[in-house]
Amino acid sequence: MLFRSFSGKLDSNPFYNEVLEIAREENSEVVPICARLEEEISDMSMEDKMMFLEEIGLQESGLDRLIKAGYHLLGLLSYLTAGKPEVRAWTITRGTKAPQAAGKIHSDFERGFIRAEVISYEDLIANGSIAAAKEKGLVRSEGKEYVMQDGDVVLFRFNV
């Protein structure tokens, strides 16, 4: 459930607790969003937005929380590819195996799938580069049965 508030003070909103109770009864979740806050941060740079959110005790915007909740509800995840022309996120359903994920990029990738070189986004960021992560053995070679994970950074090897 999405709960839209014009004030950032959810505790003082008499309807918020009612919505939480309904969500609990329906085995659902509530994503509170403050319209004024979202409007304020929409024009900020990423750096200013993160500083502002940290100052008010939040780690991410309501919009980001809404997107994550939507992905969870729909059973979706994202994986990343990085090459010379672009870095891109691809959306797939949970449980998708590597060859089918490769097919989202191009049907030839699925047809000629050999393997996927995979590293988690967190490991990549922590190490600064794929080369540094490879030195530590964090880049894995996965086969046709590998089930893609949210945040995988992948290089698909294929031959057609």
Feature map (PLM): residue ranges:
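Short, small-residue-biased leader/transition segments that mark boundaries at the very start
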Residues: 1-2
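Short linear motifs at secondary-structure transitions and domain/linker junctions
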Residues: 5-8, 54-56, 66-67, 89-95, ...
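Nucleotide-binding motor/catalytic cores of P-loop/tubulin-like NTPases across gene-expression machines
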Residues: 15, 35-43, 86-155
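Short, surface-exposed secondary-structure boundary micro-motifs
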Residues: 158-159
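Canonical P-loop GTPase G-domain recognition
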Residues: 6-83
